[in-house]
Design a protein with these regions (language model features):
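Catalytic activation segment of kinase domains across protein kinase-like and atypical kinase folds
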Residues: 5, 19-60
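ATP/Mg2+ or Mg2+-diphosphate-binding catalytic cores
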Residues: 109-162
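Active-site capping/gating regions of soluble enzymes
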Residues: 16-18, 23, 75, 96-99
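All-alpha amphipathic helical-bundle segments outside canonical DNA-binding/catalytic cores
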Residues: 91-103
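Short, well-structured alpha-helical interface segments that form or flank functional binding sites
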Residues: 28-31, 43, 74-78, 94
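Active-site activation/catalytic loop segments of kinase-like enzymes and analogous catalytic loops
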Residues: 45-89, 105-124
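ATP-dependent phospho-/nucleotidyl transfer catalytic cores
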Residues: 1-13, 18-32, 126-134, 145, ...
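Secondary-structure capping and boundary motifs in well-ordered enzyme cores
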Residues: 8, 13, 40, 103-108, ...
């Protein structure tokens, strides 16, 4: 879809997680986005998806108890509403429709990256224990499975704000 021009390249952050947003201590409001070395042309769904992977999960990225891992649809809804409204009508209908798939894709991609790092000796992601990246991989793939099961609800949420 990107190659045939239906999904435009946008300026994307490519590391959209909460710790890359400076928050004002007094107001609790976002001040600015940081860690700009990853900014480049990309797909909106990927930025949205990475933030959902991080922000709508019910568990930490390295949770060992996989029964705690799921995508919180309320958090997905709140974020989707803010994201779509915050884009001020700039997104195409197809870009908006692809947002849930972006969440699944980016979660899967990160799971594979954690597994690759584990298999290659844990040289890229900092680890705190033996098997840490393998735990991260399992958590991400469990989250992917849950997102796939919830895809109809995620699509319905997105349609509300389209």
């Amino acid at each position: 879809m990107q190659l045939d021009g239906r999904l435009p390249l946008r300026v994307t952050h490519n590391d959209t997680k909460l710790n890359n947003i400076m928050i004002d201590d007094a107001t609790g409001k976002a001040i600015c986005v940081i860690d700009l070395d990853t900014v480049m042309p990309g797909l909106t769904a990927n930025d949205f998806g990475d933030s959902i992977r991080f922000g709508a999960s019910t568990a930490l990225e390295d949770e060992r108890d996989l029964s705690k891992v799921s995508c919180d649809l309320h958090l997905f809804d709140v974020y989707a509403k803010g994201f779509i409204e915050g884009c001020g009508g700039a997104l195409t209908d197809l870009e908006i429709e692809m947002l849930p798939m972006g969440a699944i894709l980016m979660t899967f991609e990160n799971g594979i990256r954690f597994l690759t790092d584990h298999l290659e000796g844990d040289h890229y992601f900092h680890i705190h224990r033996e098997g840490h990246n393998l735990d991260r991989c399992r958590t991400q793939l469990t989250l992917v499975k849950d997102m796939q099961e919830k895809l109809p609800q995620m699509n319905e949420i997105i349609r509300k704000y389209k």
